[in-house]
Amino acid sequence: MKQGMQGFVDAFNTRAPQASGTDLSPEQQNDAELARYANAALAAQTDAAFLDSAESYYALMGEGFQSGSIVGDQETNDAALAYCRALSSSGITDIPASANDLPFLSFLPYAIATAPSFLPFIPFLLSSILVLGATRPGTLAAKAPVPKFRRLIQIVFSIIVAGTAMLLAGLAPGGIYALVLNGFGQIGYPIAFFHDGALTTTTAGNVFTALLLALLAGGTLISVCSAVLSTATRRVLAGPLTSALLVAAPAFPLLSDSALGHNAVLGLLPLPVFSPIEATGYVGCFPTEFIGSGSGSASMLAVALAYVAVFFTVGAVATRSPKQPGPAKKHHGLELLDVSVGYGSTTILSIGSLFLSPGTAAGLVAPNGSGKTTLLEALSGQFPTRIRSGSLAADGICQRRSAEFAELVYLSSSGSADLYPTLSAIEHLAFVREAWKSAADIDSLCDSLGISPYLDKPTRKLSTGMKQQVKLAMAIATDCPYLILDEPLNGLDPGKRKTSCDAMRSEVARGRSVLISSHLLDDLADLTNSFYFIEAGTLVEKIKSSSQTLKQEYLDTYEGGE
């Protein structure tokens, strides 16, 4: 405002005639009056004094525009006049001189408007990648016995919470600076601007609220889109990449605001929500500065909510458990019947039957690359696409009923897939106990396995052997009647192997069933009741034998009797 007034005064002084007031024409007298008000405003020592002179200046300028004696930007003048009058009527006299004078309430719109439109939504994109990565198939969170649609809701909520926390962390430094130096601001602080030839008046509180709603709507849409598409496609990055394209789309000329306004199809896309300033309006460091229409808040939210509903509908369909007949025999046990096992378009195993009865331990023996892990993943029910045909059930519960099946069957994966690097061993065990509603005595279990001394360490700091014992403790702590253990003895010294074998033997004695994949044939022969070999893409059951006999059978089967 002051810059415009100073410019007028300078121009007036340059062209002002050296004559008395009686020699001035009406237009010159009007200019002199304007210059007087402008000088008074510029010389004002308080905002209240400035406001009195500024209102008179803009009112007189408005008369000049109406009479035609003044030409120029009438809309800016009228907006400034409306702003001054609103301040006067509300009794507010605070006028920010620059962005550094903005209170907290005005800082957020200013910060969002001066940044690229996609920037506020990057936290939600990052959080979607992190959360979906932490809950991808095969992770501990994905194994929990939770209905698929409820898990989807939990993932969406986690993305929203994490994204909001990241966004607040990014805005915190500037927001705290504005709050400490300039205060919170006044909710009723007036804002006036022109758009499409119409004067619009609102308040800082309204703009702040509308912007928060726009950011939340955009973040929610990103969260739902990312979670649903990644769940439906079983690809962690499918959802976040699609969301990233939507967020970036408003930056493309084809999808600009003008294009959206003239294209019915583009207008149906939820793109305005990713340009929140366009929908909510914006005041810069001075309240008559304006970017965006400020008239699309309601429609923007309606479209965003409609898309959220559509995505949730897709998610409900994608997570629905299809009807599938169970196996012919419905007695207690883990049963695989007439199954083809594979991944992608490749079938690697054809299995007539596999039955693991309660209170038994079975071993799975085969060379690396023969399909052991793929078979174990299929048996776990966590990877439904591994079973290309046939049926899998535990105690008559079909694996398609994922939550009920997960209460019965637990897969302890090889490597560190079950462990989160930043969480401690005790946090993993607490999660397992809570998720599976287990009554396991964690303290006693940890003592028996010898892992109590390092329970509080993040798992990334544990050795391979320590991780193996933590994973075994997690499997036991689920209280699932059927445990599938992929290479549970790898990386253990002889003493720890004995401890782990004793723990597994104890669980079998309690009536639990254990299927163990291992290359340590001596331990396997001592621990299990029967064995399965993978031969030429089929599963072959072997009778109980000594370790020496088992080794010879292994050599005969896979090494040609050498």
Locations of the language-model features?
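The feature captures the beta-strand-to-loop junction immediately N-terminal to the Walker
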Residues: 365-367
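Q-loop/switch helix immediately C-terminal to the Walker
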Residues: 411, 421-435
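Secretory targeting signals
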Residues: 93-128, 157-227, 231
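Helix-to-loop junction immediately C-terminal to a conserved catalytic motif
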Residues: 380
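Conserved ABC ATPase "signature" region
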Residues: 430, 439-455
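Conserved ABC transporter NBD signature motif
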Residues: 385-405, 541
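Terminal transmembrane helical anchor/hairpin motif
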Residues: 92-102, 183-205, 246-326, 557-560
